[in-house]
Every structure is written in C-alpha cells, then in structure tokens.
C-alpha cells in the first residue's frame, strides 16, 4: 500500500485506495458498478502487463496477475518512479483482497507503438464478477510518440490509434456475449469514447456506459457526427476542478467535476481525486480551468488544420531528431540530452520557428484577455450586488 495522500493544506484525503480499503469487500450484487470503480480500472490499465496477460484471449485471475507483476517489479522500484502512473499497480493489492474485484479476470492485453504512424495504444479487458466486462484503454504514457499523438487529435479526422481502438473494441465485442463498459483515463478516455461511437452497431448495443476520465475531446466534425450524438447519453465525463486536458477540443458532454488533492496540471492524476463513501466529491469548476478553457478554445479556433499540424511537427521535431523515445531520458541523461535537443532545434527552418513563436505569442495574448474578461465579470458582479437599484429589482 502506498502512503496516504495529502491535500494542499497537508490534510489526509480519501482516494481510490481508501475506497478499495473501505468498499473492496462489497460485491457488485450489493452495490452496482459506479464511477469510482471505473476510475480504479482505468488507472489499473496503466500497469505494464507485458508477459503477464496474454493477447490471445487466455484468461488469468487478478491474483495471478498481481503475483506475476510483483515478481518482475519491486515495490521500491515503483515508488522511486516519479511518473503518476507508476503507482497504479499498487491498486491490485487491495483489489485482490476483497469480494468486489477479487474474482475479476484479465484478458486480451495489447501494448503497441508504431513510430511511423505516431501511434501508442494499450488496452486490456477486465471480466467483472457481476457478469459484465470493462474494456480499458490506457492513457498517454511517457513516450514522445504518445504525447505527439495527443497533439495530432487537434488536426486529424482520425488517428491510427483511434482506428486501432475501434478494431480492438469490435474484436472484444464480437467475442463476449455480455454487457460492456468502456473507459480510460486521459487519452484512454478519448479512445474509449471514439471507439464506442464508431464501432459496429451490434457491439455498440452491448455498451452500457462509456467513461472518459479527464480525456481530451475531438474535432467538431466528430462531435457533430450522427454516431457520436447517438452515444452522448452513455458518455460519463469526469474531470478535476482545475481540468486542462479534459477541456481540450470539443466533447458536448456534461462534465462531472470532482475535487482533487493536487494543484494545476497535477490534478490530471486520477489517484488524487477525492472520494467520499462510494462516490467522488463533486465541486464547481475552478476559475483557473474556465480561463484556460476559454484561452485554449479561442487559440485553436484561430488555427486551421494545416497550422495545427505545423505547430505540432515543429514542437516535436527536436525530440524526434535526437532519437528520444521517452521524456524520462531528459532527467536520466540531463545535459547530454538537452545539448542534443538544442542542436536539433537549430535545424528547424527559420520561418517555422517564427510561426511557432507567433502562435505562442498569440496564446499569451488570448490568456491575458481571458483573465481580464474574468476579472471584469467579477467586478461587475460585485457592483451589481452593491447597487440599491439592482437589489430592488430582485
């Protein structure tokens, strides 16, 4: 078990780990599958099950998966890793103890990276004790390809990862004769929604709910499609109160905003989301999130697809030119990597450098405008509260 999580004030807070400790012995027959269970499985999908869970449909138990994983990876190794998803395997400790997930089985694990198509996708299917299955798509890992694919969502009608997600869901849906739940965290949420919208109709009929846990949205042509609109009632979108990733692009979903013990972008880590009994603690969206959402939305609206692609390719060129595969290499090799990165950056044509700087400057201006607009709204709201005329009119 990992150490307790504290909020910004240093107070102990309850997370999915506490949920498993409190409710892990409650079977689905007594308390049906709900939002916190979804996050547990979406986070568990970050676990590296290579060599443990087969891709051919062979089923293994949660206990077997846990024993195999911790025989290959020490707990000290995981705790030393600073990435947010490195702690996800510890979920198996509590899950394997209780009656809620203790009898769960794992199967059809895939973990694929295709540099040529700028695609990183991993998925796994969890067979739940209640007779349904949760198809989980992993979110963005520490790979350069994985992060670039996230940027590609802004200008491609369909990425290769999204296409592969449809294929995977169709394969699982055709093999399983049971209700399906589909979900994921971060990019995994995007893949879960996209695959569910555009999978075979016979598979879509089996889907009870689709969970996007702080997953980015889509191009408007996707959210305007008939398939997506038909899926909307089944989409459960959960974002932290200072969401950044989950408010990117379009979704048309009604977001469920939850409290996090972290600040800023660190709220993207689902293991910081706060739980009370068997539900998340819901709160209003923070002013910071509203400002970022307005700024990023305005910025992207002013760029066509070609400009978005130019920006993405230019930003990622130095990483690719140095042969860097993961961002952890920066901390591992420090100045050697930084020096190579700067040398590669000099190879970017001057006109593209200017275009990126122009776009970043535009982003800064829009951010300033959004903050000014928000503060002006606060002042006007305060004046309205203090105005006798306004009080009388109410």
Model regions: which residues?
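Gly/Ala-rich beta-loop-alpha elbow adjacent to hydrolase catalytic centers
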Residues: 183-188, 192
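Alpha/beta hydrolase fold serine-hydrolase catalytic domain that processes acyl esters and thioesters
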Residues: 2-56, 60-124, 128-133, 137-179, ...
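Short glycine-enriched nucleophile-adjacent loop
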Residues: 192-201
């Amino acid at each position: 078990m990992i150490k307790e999580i504290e909020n910004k004030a240093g107070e102990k807070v309850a997370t999915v780990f506490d949920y498993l400790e409190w409710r892990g012995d409650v079977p689905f027959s007594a308390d049906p599958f709900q939002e916190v269970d979804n996050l547990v499985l979406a986070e568990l999908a970050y676990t590296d099950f290579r060599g443990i869970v087969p891709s051919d449909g062979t089923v293994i138990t949660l206990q077997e998966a846990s024993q195999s994983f911790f025989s290959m990876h020490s707990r000290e190794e995981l705790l030393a890793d600073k990435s947010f998803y490195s702690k996800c395997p510890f979920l198996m400790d509590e899950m394997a103890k209780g009656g809620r997930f203790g009898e769960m089985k794992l199967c059809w694990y895939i973990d694929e990276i295709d540099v040529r198509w700028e695609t990183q996708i991993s998925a796994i299917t969890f067979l739940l004790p209640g007779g349904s299955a949760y198809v989980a798509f992993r979110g963005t890992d520490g790979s350069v390809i994985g992060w670039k694919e996230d940027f590609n969502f802004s200008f491609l009608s369909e990425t290769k990862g999204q296409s592969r997600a449809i294929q995977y869901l169709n394969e699982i849906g055709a093999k399983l004769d049971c209700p399906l739940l589909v979900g994921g965290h971060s990019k995994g949420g995007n893949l879960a929604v996209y695959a569910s919208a555009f999978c075979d109709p016979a598979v879509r009929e089996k889907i009870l709910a689709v969970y996007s846990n702080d997953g980015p949205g889509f191009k408007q042509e996707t959210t305007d499609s008939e398939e997506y609109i038909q899926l909307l009632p089944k989409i459960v979108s959960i974002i932290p109160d200072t969401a950044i990733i989950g408010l990117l692009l379009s979704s048309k979903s009604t977001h469920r905003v939850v409290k996090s013990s972290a600040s800023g972008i660190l709220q993207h880590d689902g293991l910081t989301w706060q739980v009370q009994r068997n539900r998340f603690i819901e709160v209003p969206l923070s002013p910071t999130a509203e400002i970022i959402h307005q700024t990023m939305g305005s910025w992207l609206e002013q760029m066509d697809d070609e400009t978005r692609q130019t920006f993405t390719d230019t930003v990622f060129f130095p990483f690719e030119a140095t042969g860097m595969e993961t961002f952890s290499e920066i901390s591992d090799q420090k100045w050697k990597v930084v020096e190579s990165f700067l040398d590669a950056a000099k190879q970017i044509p001057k006109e593209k450098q200017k275009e990126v700087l122009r776009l970043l400057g535009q982003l800064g201006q829009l951010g300033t405008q959004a903050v000014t607009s928000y503060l002006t709204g606060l002042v006007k709201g305060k004046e309205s509260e203090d105005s006798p005329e306004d009080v009388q009119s109410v």
